[in-house]
């Protein structure tokens, strides 16, 4: 899957699909958070996540800017990450190239 390279770095971890702020309690340290987009309310979760993948957004979008501030690899503007990536999948996020690769198809 490809999108916009928004924050450099490479990270491999487990997908956590988060559709909104009401699901923040499900996020665990090191998760690869996959979401439609972020807003300022999401800033509280950035310090603990391993990487970020969003359906929408560009290089100057909120998720891209905040990910860069926190040094978190991020790929934004994938179009359909929340539909394609599944909870518990192991993925590698390459925020330098704008690529998300599924490491395996096993689920937790």
Each language-model region and where it sits:
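Non-catalytic, soluble scaffold/interaction modules
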Residues: 1-108
């Amino acid at each position: 899957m490809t999108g916009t390279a928004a924050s450099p770095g490479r990270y491999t971890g487990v997908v956590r699909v988060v559709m909104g702020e009401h699901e923040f309690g499900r996020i665990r340290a090191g998760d690869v958070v996959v979401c439609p987009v972020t807003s300022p309310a999401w800033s509280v979760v950035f310090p603990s996540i391993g990487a970020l993948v969003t359906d929408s957004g560009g290089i100057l979008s909120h998720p891209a800017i905040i990910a860069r501030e926190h040094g978190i690899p991020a790929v934004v503007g994938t179009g359909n990450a929340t539909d394609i990536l599944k909870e518990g999948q192991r993925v590698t996020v390459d925020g330098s190239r704008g690529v998300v690769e599924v490491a395996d198809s096993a689920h937790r």
